């Protein structure tokens, strides 16, 4: 069916978790208060990362800034960058808490060389300093709900509203992921994309209340909407399907899975003078911005 491979026993909640949660670091974390992040001798701890098929150690700061640089545009406003930094840090620490200490991190990030290559020499210095400042100025800050670290998904552009976590995951464990209106997203030039995929006899058979696809019929089989999006590299989880000359025409709205923070709206809010905390509290209901304490990470001063 157009190259589509169905996972017979696929579970929606587990699939989303695999997509949205970063893999763990070689690290132990204890959350026991609201004081500042403790660092050994004032230097950044090291984490083990798989890069170019090899494992190596880099500083936690280098890794966090590298993810931040890869995940959001360098020309974003300061408060939007800070909000993104908090989401990345929260995901890191939640993975640490949930998954343990023995896994090598594989989440992609940009090195300094990749930043310069992607941004160009004219912007590299300015953008790097903005990323570093956003990371440093939110040092230790994470999002918590009811005293626990939360799942912190984000996406580039919504279809005009974000989706409910409880609805997307089919679970009541995500009360802080409520659907939020993002009216300016629909005005973005990247809001709509049209593509063609091989095969026909495909039909959207389920959507959530925000309009994102939850289920697709492919011939005699039914597949999860997010798996369908990723298999066919669609821009968004909000899409329609139409038979077209033996193929399937896909019209997608937005960019990404639609959960959590819309980066586009976050940048607009920052431009309007909203703070990092105001942005985060808009997209994540009833959460608090806290600070982690007592971090113990495997050290290697040489990063080897």
Residue ranges and their predicted role:
Residues 1-304:
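Conserved, single-site charged/polar hotspot
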């Amino acid at each position: 069916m157009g190259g589509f491979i169905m996972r017979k026993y696929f579970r929606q909640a587990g699939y989303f978790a695999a997509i949205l949660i970063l893999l763990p670091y070689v690290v132990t974390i204890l959350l026991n208060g609201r004081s500042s992040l403790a660092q050994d001798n004032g230097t950044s701890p090291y984490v083990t990362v798989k890069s170019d098929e090899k494992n190596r150690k880099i500083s936690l700061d280098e890794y966090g800034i590298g993810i931040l640089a890869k995940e959001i545009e360098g020309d974003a406003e300061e408060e939007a960058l800070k909000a993104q930094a908090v989401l990345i840090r929260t995901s890191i620490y939640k993975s640490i808490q949930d998954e343990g200490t023995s896994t090598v991190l594989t989440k992609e990030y940009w090195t300094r060389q990749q930043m310069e290559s992607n941004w160009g020499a004219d912007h590299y210095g300015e953008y790097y300093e903005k990323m570093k400042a956003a990371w440093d100025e939110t040092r230790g800050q994470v999002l918590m709900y009811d005293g626990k670290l939360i799942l912190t998904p984000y996406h580039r552009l919504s279809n005009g509203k974000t989706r409910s976590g409880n609805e997307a995951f089919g679970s009541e464990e995500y009360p802080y992921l409520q659907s939020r209106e993002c009216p300016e997203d629909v005005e973005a030039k990247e809001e709509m994309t049209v593509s063609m995929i091989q095969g026909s006899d495909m039909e959207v058979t389920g959507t959530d209340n925000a309009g994102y696809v939850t289920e697709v019929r492919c011939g005699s089989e039914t597949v999860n909407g997010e798996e369908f999006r990723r298999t066919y590299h669609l821009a968004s989880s909000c899409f329609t399907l139409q038979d077209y000359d033996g193929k399937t025409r896909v019209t997608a709205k937005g960019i990404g899975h639609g959960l959590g923070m819309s980066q586009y709206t976050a940048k607009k809010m920052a431009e309007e003078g909203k703070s990092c905390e105001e942005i985060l509290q808009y997209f994540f209901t009833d959460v608090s911005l806290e600070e982690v304490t007592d971090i113990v990470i495997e050290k290697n001063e040489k990063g080897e």
